[in-house]
């Protein structure tokens, strides 16, 4: 299945028919009208405030910005929300400073975070027409990136160590040598589905189309490109140049 996801964003940014404010509203706010724009601008400004008063103001006002917020959610400073009405956060969740929750898309579900989830400092959850769902008690450590053009789903009690990268989609076609790769269609392979109680070590990469069974472990630095059954322990990665894009058969190694 191919979707021209990234190319469409580039076209939107270059659309001369829209004002700068209109482009900002479409990419960040996700709802029409000046009222939605002003509400978004004011409430996201609260992310800058320090101390107890900043925490209290975010706790009081962020539920009106987001689609759903449970009791006792802790919002850190300098958070970024895009299309916030499609972001749902369960009770007792903590979102650390500088995290990004981007539910961007026209018809997607957006981001759904379970109860007592931890989203670490600088973590990025980003949708490009896709969806992201995190089960209860899951921990997404600092600087992890979850990028979804289709679907990323994590079960309960999952633990992602720092700098993990999960990408559902993002496999660009590169058959057309006359067109920049970033402007060619993005190929989706079914998303990423991870069962309960899975541990991904630091720097693990999980590619599109992968299913990881419950209670599995991937060692630090692993690249997971195939399905893993329940209770699996996987580690390692290897990249080889296998062919030349210009044709002519396998490339020299």
Short names for language-model regions:
Residues 153, 217, 222-223, 231:
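A generic "structured core" feature
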Residues 210-211, 216:
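Glycine/small-residue-rich hydrophobic helix-like segments
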Residues 226:
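Short helix N-cap motif at coil->helix boundaries in the Bergerat
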Residues 70, 139, 211, 229:
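Short conserved AdoMet
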Residues 80-89, 94-206, 210, 237-238, ...:
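Flexible, glycine/small-residue-enriched loop-and-beta-strand segment within the central core
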Residues 234:
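Conserved active-site beta-strand element of glycosyltransferases/polysaccharide synthases
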Residues 1-72, 157, 164, 169-173, ...:
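Terminal amphipathic alpha-helical/low-complexity segments used for targeting or macromolecular assembly
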